[in-house]
């Protein structure tokens, strides 16, 4: 029967189930493994797994009445294949597991041990870690000691550890997460996929922050060059997903506007940058990327955002059922969905060819968990190179590659609030890693010289005195943990930037944010941050522990999103893969609105659901 099914014309669930049973012979050999795997993977798109199990139980019971021993054993072979191919489904779905146990109990009662032995539900391992966003898997040790200083990390080392972090997060995504995203058009009640998207966005933002943390144009150019080579190594690892995140950060408007910085980037680096950008551009429906991915052998990490876009497009274009009664499923759509999801599922079966250093993983995890808004990054960019600054006169005529319509950020929703226990765990492990690697004399404290090295990994760190709470000239483990926990609590896990202070006067007394004493007098007795409005005494400036959080007006995401196309005007939810949007520029202070944004930014695409 498997050979007579014409999926393009549609079929019922029962017909497809019968076809999968008949795909087995009595010995358990599968004649049509593609059909069987497709149906077992895709059936939750149409019916719950518990209903499928009930249908299998009914078929087995009916075959007993008909004395069809062949049908009985084939049904058991299908159940065995299902458990073997998708074990997580049985561990995470208690109702499904109970139904299969009911079938096995029925076989045992009949004394049919041959058939019963085919169904081994009790040996399914636990997969609850796939549903726990806070779970951390053990990692292998590097044979040599690795420097944790960003400037000392080789591009391949950083590429390998970024690959490991994203791969570990990706392995937790299940079929049900993709199905939920496509049907709802968002990540509501989908924490695993939401966390992966946040990690992708964090990599892009971290790239921008590491560049903007450098005070001079030549220093920023060196960081850009470093990340271009990291992107090159990501391509060698065939990790296109993190490659997209890094290129998105390098191509962001907060970086692309730094003309003086780009004048210090070598022509060779610019050429390499352009090639990597062209690889992940949206031109031709990501044609360059798709061709490169198809030619890959071994481990490869596809750009999840591109394939989610494909799933959403299919969901909008084709119906699940071919009749109003919802009895004949759309086999053509099922095959197309399966081809996309099978490519994603293949990633988890091939481990990346990397080893990870636990200390560096802890450091990266905490670094990437910090969050800055686009406005904050853009504001820091303006502080580095104000718009009024004349163009640099440099013999180097290099310009950055044009900003591509890449997936800079996958969702316009706010970053999900992290579990506090996870934040504490990450911070404590990171601090322990810092002391193990940067406490050179082993006295259990960080000196000012050692602190300056650490600051290379955390450019948003406050002054040394803010961490040295007892002012003894060194920082203890407890003081460093306390600083990060305090910053995470006050700022909601979002580290800020240094203040842009100027002398100010006031007709009314204001309190110093550090010492809480009043700032008296109208003749510039205090300082005020131009970005966030924080006031403090001049003598308290370097001791202020509050990070700069630039004030911004509330922005309606619905108002800033482009209008849906006419053919989908009946839908109201919008899912955006890109930032910034034209509507958000109006929320910046007046000096930012004067900035001319590159016209290519309008080329980013939105998916409207």
Curated annotation (Swiss-Prot):
Span of domain EF-hand: 426-461, 455-490
Keyword Signal set for record: no
Transmembrane segment boundaries: none
Region of interest (Disordered), ranges: 382-406, 557-592
Binding site for Ca(2+) 2: 468, 470, 472, 474, 479
Keyword field contains DNA damage: no
This protein's UniProt keywords: Calcium, Cell membrane, Cell projection, Cytoplasm, Disease variant, Guanine-nucleotide releasing factor, Membrane, Metal-binding, Phosphoprotein, Repeat, Synapse, Synaptosome, Zinc, Zinc-finger
Membrane topology of the entry: Peripheral membrane protein
Compartments it resides in: Cytoplasm, Cytosol; Cell membrane; Synapse, Synaptosome; Cell projection, Ruffle membrane
Effect of residue 248 to W: In BDPLT18; prevents Rap1 activation upon calcium stimulation; reduces platelet adhesion and spreading
Regulation of catalytic or functional activity: Isoform 1 and isoform 2 are differently regulated by calcium and DAG.
GO CC annotations, alphabetized: cytosol; neuron projection; plasma membrane; ruffle membrane; synapse
Family that this chain belongs to: Belongs to the RASGRP family.
Protein name according to UniProt: RAS guanyl-releasing protein 2
Organism of this sequence: Homo sapiens (Human)
Lineage of source species: Eukaryota, Metazoa, Chordata, Craniata, Vertebrata
């Amino acid at each position: 029967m498997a050979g007579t099914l014409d999926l393009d014309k549609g079929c019922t669930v029962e017909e497809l189930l019968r076809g999968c049973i008949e795909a087995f012979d009595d010995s358990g050999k599968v004649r049509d493994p593609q059909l069987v795997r497709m149906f077992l993977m895709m059936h939750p798109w149409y019916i719950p797994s518990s209903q499928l199990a009930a249908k299998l139980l009914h078929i087995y019971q009916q075959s007993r009445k008909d004395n069809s021993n062949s049908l009985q054993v084939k049904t058991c072979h299908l159940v065995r294949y299902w458990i073997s191919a998708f074990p997580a489904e049985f561990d995470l779905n208690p109702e499904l597991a109970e139904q299969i146990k009911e079938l096995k109990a029925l076989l045992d009662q009949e004394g049919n041990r041959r058939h019963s032995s085919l169904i081994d539900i009790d040996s399914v391992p636990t997969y609850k870690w796939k549903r726990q966003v806070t779970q951390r898997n053990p990692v292998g040790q590097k044979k040599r000691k690795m420097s944790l200083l960003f400037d000392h990390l080789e591009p391949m080392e950083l590429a390998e550890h970024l690959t490991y972090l994203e791969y570990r997060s990706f392995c937790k995504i299940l079929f049900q997460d993709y199905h939920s995203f496509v049907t709802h058009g968002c990540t509501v009640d989908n924490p695993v996929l939401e966390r992966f998207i946040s990690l992708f966005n964090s990599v892009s933002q971290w790239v921008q922050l590491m560049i903007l943390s450098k005070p001079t144009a030549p220093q920023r150019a060196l960081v850009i060059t470093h990340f271009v080579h990291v992107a090159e190594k990501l391509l060698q690892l065939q990790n296109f997903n993190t490659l997209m995140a890094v290129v998105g950060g390098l191509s962001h408007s907060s970086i692309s506007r730094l003309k003086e910085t780009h004048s210090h980037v070598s022509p060779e680096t610019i050429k390499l940058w352009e090639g990597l950008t062209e690889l992940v551009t949206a031109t031709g429906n990501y044609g360059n990327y798709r061709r490169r991915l198809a030619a890959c052998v071994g481990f490869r990490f596809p750009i999840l955002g591109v394939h989610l876009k494909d799933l959403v497009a299919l969901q909008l274009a084709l119906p699940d059922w071919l009749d109003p009664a919802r009895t004949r499923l759309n086999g053509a759509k099922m095959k197309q969905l399966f081809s996309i999801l099978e490519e994603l599922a293949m990633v988890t079966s091939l481990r990346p060819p990397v080893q990870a250093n636990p200390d560096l993983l802890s450091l990266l995890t905490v670094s990437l968990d910090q969050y800055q808004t686009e406005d904050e990054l853009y504001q820091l960019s303006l502080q580095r190179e104000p718009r009024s600054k004349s163009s640099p006169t440099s013999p180097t005529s290099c310009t950055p590659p044009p900003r591509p319509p890449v997936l800079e950020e996958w969702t316009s929703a706010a970053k999900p609030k992290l579990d506090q226990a996870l934040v504490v765990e990450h911070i404590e492990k990171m601090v322990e890693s810092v002391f193990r690697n940067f406490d050179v004399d082993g006295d259990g404290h960080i000196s000012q010289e050692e602190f300056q090295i650490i600051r290379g990994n955390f450019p948003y760190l406050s002054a040394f005195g803010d961490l040295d709470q007892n002012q003894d000239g060194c920082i203890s483990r407890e003081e460093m943990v306390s600083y990060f926990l305090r910053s995470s609590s006050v700022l909601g896990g979002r580290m800020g930037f240094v203040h842009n202070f100027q002398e100010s006067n006031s007709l009314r007394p204001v309190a110093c944010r550090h010492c809480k004493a009043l700032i008296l007098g109208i003749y510039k007795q205090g300082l005020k941050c131009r970005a966030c409005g924080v006031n403090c005494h001049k003598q308290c400036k370097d001791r202020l522990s509050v990070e700069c959080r630039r004030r911004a007006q509330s922005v309606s995401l619905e108002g800033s999103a482009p209008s849906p196309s006419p053919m989908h005007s009946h839908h109201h939810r919008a899912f955006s893969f890109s930032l910034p949007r034209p509507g958000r520029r109006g929320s910046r202070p007046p000096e930012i609105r004067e900035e001319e944004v590159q016209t290519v930014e309008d080329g980013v695409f939105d998916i409207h659901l």
